[in-house]
Design a protein with these regions (language model features):
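Acidic, metal/ion-coordinating pockets
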Residues: 1-177
């Protein structure tokens, strides 16, 4: 198994996360924590994200940003899992163009060459942007999962090239791919 959690709203008042919360997730079996627009709301996370490769921030945050937005992990069965964390542009003003970042990413990394599976966590506000990213990565990823806490999880799809997409997962404590 390989567990990815979007933990950006796990801290008090539902904004950000802390080192302690990350460690609690890891102790529960989480392999990777992704984030979104609330990644920096708990300032202590800025130091921790620099040293913790299992904690990702959106790759398309304005540079220079602490941490990383993509990492390749190996499972117990030696399967290489790439996890890419992206954030939408609609109503999210802290990031570069998600499609340009995605295009650059796909020119640098290839499914099966660099990793066996690619999980894309797309943190965004609107369903149409999540669907557009799903189609953008169709055939280039294993799955695309849309995260944020504003819409219900009721829209799983298998796209033309056989990859599933889900525009929304549950909150951090239940957000498992």
């Amino acid at each position: 198994d390989f567990v990815v959690v979007n933990g950006e709203n796990a801290a008090a008042q539902g904004v950000g996360l802390t080192e302690e919360i990350c460690k609690d997730f890891y102790n529960c079996g989480v392999n990777v924590i992704t984030t979104g627009n609330h990644v920096w709301d708990q300032k202590e996370i800025m130091k921790y994200i620099e040293k913790e490769e299992r904690l990702l921030r959106p790759k398309n945050l304005f540079e220079p940003a602490p941490g990383r937005g993509f990492q390749i992990f190996k499972t117990d069965k030696n399967i290489r899992v790439g996890v890419l964390n992206l954030m939408g542009n609609v109503f999210m003003k802290k990031c570069d163009d998600v499609f340009e970042t995605s295009k650059k990413f796909l020119s640098e990394y290839k499914l099966k060459d660099d990793y066996d599976l690619l999980v894309v966590d797309f943190h965004g506000e609107i369903t149409s942007e999540k669907m557009a990213i799903g189609h953008f990565f169709d055939g280039y990823s294993t799955c695309v999962v849309g995260t944020h806490t504003h819409i219900p999880t009721a829209d799983t799809r298998i796209l033309d090239k056989g990859k599933g997409t889900r525009k929304k997962t549950a909150k951090a404590s239940r957000s498992v791919v």
